Amino acid sequence: MKLIQISSKHYKFLYDLLSERKQFENISHKKLPSYNNHIKFIKSKPYSKWLLIECKEKIIGSVYLSKNNEIAIWIKKGIKDYKMKIRKKVLEEIITKFTRKRYFANINPRNKKIINFYKKNGFKLFYSTFQLEGKKDENLKSDDKRKIEFYKKNGYRIAQHVYMFEKNL
């Protein structure tokens, strides 16, 4: 397994990889952007590091490290990542090559497989964000139970809930 730089010849692969995601895996968008908008996004260099994952001379996924030290690893659906071994190697390589004081992973709480992966690799849950849709949006912490219940009773619905995990080095 090795990590390689992204070039324009990889745009289609990255778009296809994004297209594979199920709704519960996403936290950044509610619907798939157009191909052209995705190319603009890639060209904007939104992350500190954004690399492709190559295994046995085949590109199988991507990984990024954001400017806020957030890590996200995406592997194509057809690839059997037995017991998360590829994902673990990628995580270890990112942490080794791009040393930071701490790292984060933002995960949709319904994505149990990935939550368990990060927990097994030393990440700890330290923050939850709730997004409410209704008359107004407000970020709530998971311990704001009374506020959450108040909003639910008054016509709001939880549109998104994100767990943030961190790993300190």
Residue ranges and their predicted role:
Residues 1-16:
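A short beta-loop-alpha structural element at the N-terminal edge
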Residues 31-79:
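Acetyl-CoA-dependent GNAT
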Residues 80-97, 112-120, 145, 149, ...:
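Conserved acetyl-CoA-binding loop-helix of GNAT-fold acetyltransferases
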